[in-house]
From Swiss-Prot:
Source taxon at top rank: Bacteria
Database matches in InterPro entries: CinA, CinA-like_C, CinA_C, CinA_KH, Competence-induced_CinA, MoaB/Mog-like_dom_sf, MoaB/Mog_dom
SMART domains noted in UniProt: MoCF_biosynth
Xref: SUPFAM superfamilies: CinA-like, Molybdenum cofactor biosynthesis proteins
NCBIfam families: cinA_nterm, PncC_domain, PRK00549.1
Descriptive protein name: CinA-like protein
Membership in a protein family: Belongs to the CinA family.
Source organism of the structure: Synechococcus sp. (strain CC9902)
Length: 419
């Protein structure tokens, strides 16, 4: 069987059991795609030497490059380096200079140097060190047999990413056959489902260069465009017309590119308009405010928020009349309108968003079922009111996340319309 591409092997029982989401594999897969390196398989193995050895031997027969994460620490369940060496009958050797470096890092960080840390200074004979500038667990670049190279990384995401950028990515560009010129771009869409988006751009999904691939997440669809060429300029020239075609067909549904988030885009538009925003949340419990404040510099346009979970707080902090609550209930368009307008009045902001709904799993009625959310966007020219019915089967967290997305997207569209 001809060997092709790159595989990812993630080590850790916590990953295998689902206790921790495997964010490292996702991040690495995106970076490999950005490099134009074919990546065909991901494997997760628990902290077990025999199974780890078997997985590595199998990979050696399929791929040219294996990237591993996890299992490089000093504890008994950190088995990766020793298991890899055993899989290819290669002795481990201590690297004195590596041991000195590990001790220096631990001491500089005010941490005691344990005898177990010394195990991190042992690598298979013939392996090169993959430096870790942020932690004590070095990785390695090792070719234990012809046409097969292993790159090992710790499982700590910040350390793994730093090592990738500083050392691994340059090595891959030089040694792994990455295209000399490769451009990748991600276009992000909301307010449209994957199937509806595919209907609009379906004929473009068959393109060979650039390729166009859709990926769906909760409330969001991404199109990844990848183009190659003999030079960076030529690769960009191949990609640009496709990007323009996609944007012409999809228009307002595309909210950003690459690392853009919907919250960041909204905040940027607010900044460009010189306007401010405040939020009043009931069923989302602060999720909208959290999404906004996760963006650095948000304080320039985000005035603040109120988590008005109870009717009393809606009355006291937002000025919602008790009679309105009695007549319509907290989950109603009149109440969210009063919340949003009261918010604008008290925060002296340009825009006010209010959300109130039945996130579930209980609390629904025939008139107001689980998954029903009322939203309001108040501005200088009036108040938009709308109801979203997300359904009970999605679950509480999904209802909350989708409510945040719909609120932000409505504000995005209003800001674009006024510019």
């Amino acid at each position: 069987m001809a060997k092709t591409g790159v595989e990812i092997l993630c080590v850790g029982t916590e990953l295998l059991l689902g206790d921790i989401l495997n964010g490292n594999a996702r991040w690495l897969a995106q970076r490999l795609a950005d490099l134009g390196l074919p990546h065909f398989r991901q494997t997760v193995v628990g902290d077990n030497t025999e199974r780890l050895m078997g997985a590595v031997r199998e990979a050696a027969g399929r791929c040219r490059i294996l990237i591993t994460t996890g299992g490089l620490g000093p504890t008994p369940d950190d088995l990766t380096t020793a298991a890899l060496a055993a899989a290819f009958d290669t002795p481990l050797e201590e690297r004195p200079e590596l041991w000195e470096e590990i001790q220096a890092k631990l001491s500089a960080g005010g941490r005691a140097v344990a005898a177990s840390n010394r195990s991190q200074a042992f690598l298979p004979i013939g392996a090169d060190v993959l430096p870790n500038s942020l932690g004590s667990a070095p990785g390695m670049i090792w070719s234990p047999c012809p046409d097969f190279t292993i790159l090992t990384f710790p499982g700590v995401p910040s350390e793994m990413r730093s090592m990738w950028v500083e050392t691994a990515e340059p090595w891959l560009r030089q040694n792994a056959g990455a295209p000399s010129a490769f451009v990748s771009r991600r276009l992000h869409f909301t307010g449209i489902g994957e199937s509806d988006l595919a209907e609009q751009v379906g004929d473009l999904l068959d393109s060979a260069n650039p390729t166009v691939a859709p990926y769906a997440a909760l409330g969001d669809v991404t199109l990844r465009l990848t183009a190659s060429g003999s030079s960076p300029g030529q690769a960009e020239a191949v990609l640009h017309p496709m990007e323009e075609q996609l944007l012409q067909r999809t228009g307002r549904f595309c909210y950003g590119r690459d690392d853009d988030t919907l919250a960041a885009v909204v905040l940027r538009l607010l900044g460009e308009a010189g306007q401010t925003l405040a939020v009043a949340e009931s069923c989302t419990g602060g999720a909208l405010g959290a999404a906004l404040t996760a963006v650095p510099g948000s304080s320039a346009v985000f005035s603040g928020g109120v988590i008005a979970y109870s009717n009393a707080v809606k009355q006291q902090l937002l000025g919602v009349p008790a009679a309105l609550l009695d007549e319509h209930g907290a989950v109603s368009e009149p109440v969210v309108k009063a919340m949003a307008e009261g918010l604008r009045s008290r925060f002296h902001c340009d825009w006010g968003i209010a959300i109130s709904g039945v996130a579930g799993p209980g609390g629904g009625t025939i008139e107001k079922p689980v998954g029903m959310v009322c939203l309001a966007l108040a501005g200088r020219e009036g108040c938009d009111l709308w109801v979203q019915r997300f359904g009970a089967r999605r679950g509480r967290s999904a209802v909350q996340q989708l409510s945040v997305i719909r609120a932000l997207d409505r504000l995005r569209l209003r800001l674009l319309a006024q510019s």
